[in-house]
């Protein structure tokens, strides 16, 4: 089901840096696979912030896969993160199969860039809340909800990677406790 031949990796509980599977510095691409549209987001080269890129329309042909592969090249992506929609009861359905099939097809096109499947539970709900908080009316959300969901998927992954990566000795730190006020 999950092929390693094309560097398709399934990581249900976040990054496993012990196996050194994570690429170095560079942009990441986040993908929210839907039945009609695919939301796309990308990160800055340092992997700190996810930003929406575009919504790619799905086609019966491979036209959408071609566009996703083009984005990997255009944006010089070092890793692709595809949301895998699990249910709250840890089950998968047709949406998950669709995400897996899309990720496998994309992995074949962009090898050796790794394509990872990551848990995307409740990302659309989170994206809707973020858009509502930003003042986007419900009727206007449809045009950007897929991109917003891709941002949530990618940002969650970036945050997990940062949390799993020990601080390097050459990185400057404040030496302060989180939440502590620092005088300039």
Swiss-Prot record:
Q: Which CDD domains match?
A: YqgF (cd16964)
- According to the lineage, what is the superkingdom? Bacteria
Q: Where is this region: Disordered?
A: 1-23
**Is the Nucleus keyword given for this protein?**
no
Cited SMART domains? YqgFc
Q: Which region is the signal sequence?
A: none
| UniProt-annotated location(s) | Cytoplasm
| GO cellular component terms, semicolon-separated | cytosol
Q: Does the keyword Ribosomal protein apply?
A: no
GO BP annotations, alphabetical order: rRNA 5'-end processing
Q: Keyword set for this entry?
A: Cytoplasm, Hydrolase, Nuclease, Ribosome biogenesis
Under which main EC class is this enzyme filed?
Answer: hydrolase
Task: Give start-end ranges for the coiled-coil region(s).
Answer: none
**Entry EC no(s):** 3.1.-.-
Q: Which Pfam families match?
A: RuvX
Tell me the GO molecular function terms: nuclease activity
Q: Which InterPro entries match?
A: RNaseH-like_sf (IPR012337), YqgF (IPR005227), YqgF/RNaseH-like_dom (IPR006641), YqgF/RNaseH-like_dom_sf (IPR037027)
Tell me, in a sentence or two, what this protein's role is: Could be a nuclease involved in processing of the 5'-end of pre-16S rRNA.
Q: Which PANTHER family match?
A: POLYNUCLEOTIDYL TRANSFERASE, RIBONUCLEASE H-LIKE SUPERFAMILY PROTEIN
Family, according to the entry, reads as follows:
Belongs to the YqgF nuclease family.
Name this polypeptide is given: Putative pre-16S rRNA nuclease
Organism of derivation: Mycobacterium leprae (strain TN)
